[in-house]
A protein has these predicted regions:
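Short loop/turn elements that flank and shape the SAM/SAH-binding pocket of Class I
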Residues: 191
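Nucleotide-sugar donor-binding catalytic core of glycosyltransferases
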Residues: 1-155, 159, 163-183, 194-232
């Protein structure tokens, strides 16, 4: 059906980049579109980037009580290790072009990053709570993209006040939009010991994180836009 009145579009949540395989221009050019709240979305004046957040509630990493407990008991940033954790990353089977590409990219990145003297690797998968205990010990956490740029690990790290490290993707826009602490590299070749030592001394602001990780923050953004555009 044709939409003939102003609207705010909300879509989610998917590990795939929204613009993969098709153009989103018809949506963005719709004359009545006010804003589009979207996961794994490119930067655009009409798009508000949404996080994919934590795992589904049926999985251990989606249990709200467990997440809240980990957050409440997190180690203060200044007491964490001045090192980077490279957690265990699933290598996606090549069931799709995205899965094949993600698997190959992760294998290459893991080989390169695990050789760095300031990086500690987690070779085997741990139960979620044990994994979060390990994560909490480090100031910095590698977040290698999967079938899409956004992954749950970004938010697991932020919940523990660890700094996520990503390759430069559309995720840099999400972090910038919501004022979240994070490091982004155009190539892993640019991550060396001298640069890392400089990053250790940065003053990271985790103030916006605790608000951002609540559903209310995103709901309030939507309500604010609704109120601003009444009678549009």
């Amino acid at each position: 059906p044709h939409i003939s009145s102003p609207f705010i579009l909300i879509t989610g949540t998917s590990s795939y980049q929204v613009s993969n395989g098709c153009s989103i221009d018809p949506i963005l050019q719709h004359p009545f579109l006010i804003k589009w709240f979207c996961t794994n979305a490119p930067a655009h004046a009409k798009i508000v980037p949404l996080p994919i957040g934590f795992q589904e509630k049926e999985r251990s990493g989606g249990n709200q009580e467990s997440i809240s407990e980990c957050h409440a008991n997190k180690t203060p940033f200044e007491r964490k290790k001045d090192r980077i954790l490279l957690p265990y990353h699933i290598i996606h089977p090549p069931h799709s072009p995205e899965g094949k590409r993600a698997g190959e990219s992760r294998v290459k990145a893991i080989e390169q990053l695990s050789s760095l003297p300031f990086v500690d690797s987690q070779p085997e998968k741990l139960p979620w709570k044990d994994y979060m205990v390990l994560l909490d010990k480090y100031k910095f956490v590698m977040c290698l993209e999967g079938t899409g740029p956004d992954i749950h690990r970004n938010y697991e790290a932020l919940a523990l006040h660890c700094v996520p490290i990503n390759i430069k993707t559309i995720m840099e826009n999400l972090f910038g939009f919501h004022r979240l602490p994070g490091l982004f590299f155009s190539s892993w070749d640019h991550l060396n010991e001298d640069k890392f030592r400089n990053y250790v001394d940065f003053n990271y602001n985790f103030g916006p994180v605790d608000v951002f990780l609540k559903v209310k923050y995103h709901a309030d953004l939507i309500k604010k836009l609704q109120n601003e555009n009444r009678g549009f």
